[in-house]
Amino acid sequence: MTENLHSRKMVQPKKFRGVRQRHWGSWVSEIRHPLLKRRVWLGTFETAEEAARAYDEAAVLMSGRNAKTNFPIQRSSTGEPTPAAGRDARSNFSSGSSTTNLSQILSAKLRKCCKAPSPSLTCLRLDPEKSHIGVWQKRAGARADSNWVMTVELNKDAASTDAASQSTSATTAPPATPMDEEERIALQMIEELLSSSSPASPSNGDDQGRFII
């Protein structure tokens, strides 16, 4: 009878995202990095709620306003997401952690897990509505956003693609500012795609550039 009551107590607690219970009763929290596709260990906690709040903190640090959390996200005066941590949160890597200390600890664990973190996810993309092709980037972090790094307009005359790429490279970065490694790679990706899609000799027909992503 006692064993049945004990097993029921183990099943009753609400299930939280990124939280699981050990056989001896403690709760552990871990989160999967959205870009690196690997799990980050967040620690062991006394209650499921504390573990869930630690998960929420890590989710906001990695995904910002797009984070999927267990509890509602509070907004600061600047509009940034700030999930509140439990008052009595204690883990195996810090005892009596405050909200600020918990955020610092989680940030340190994420940096340690990702020794060479990838700040963004970059890929070639075609935008048929605006008739251009370019490099699209999604950043990770507390201020996660997505934007076009650079674009090349799809002209009807395939012979003008070289001029379009040159004008685009001239407008993407100021002349006085050296091109960083990320922009250089992005521009190289576009130039290679344009050169592989251009015909051997220009013609005045109705052919238009076709790009396959």
From Swiss-Prot:
DNA-binding region: 15-72
GO cellular component terms given for this protein: nucleus
Intracellular or extracellular location(s): Nucleus
SUPFAM superfamilies for the chain: DNA-binding domain (SSF54171)
InterPro entries xrefs: AP2/ERF_dom, AP2/ERF_dom_sf, AP2/ERF_ERF_subfamily, DNA-bd_dom_sf
A biological process term (GO) from this entry: ethylene-activated signaling pathway
Gene Ontology terms, MF aspect: DNA-binding transcription factor activity; sequence-specific DNA binding
Alphabetical list of CDD domains matching this protein: AP2 (cd00018)
Family per similarity comment: Belongs to the AP2/ERF transcription factor family. ERF subfamily.
Record-given protein name: Ethylene-responsive transcription factor WIN1
Gene: EREB46
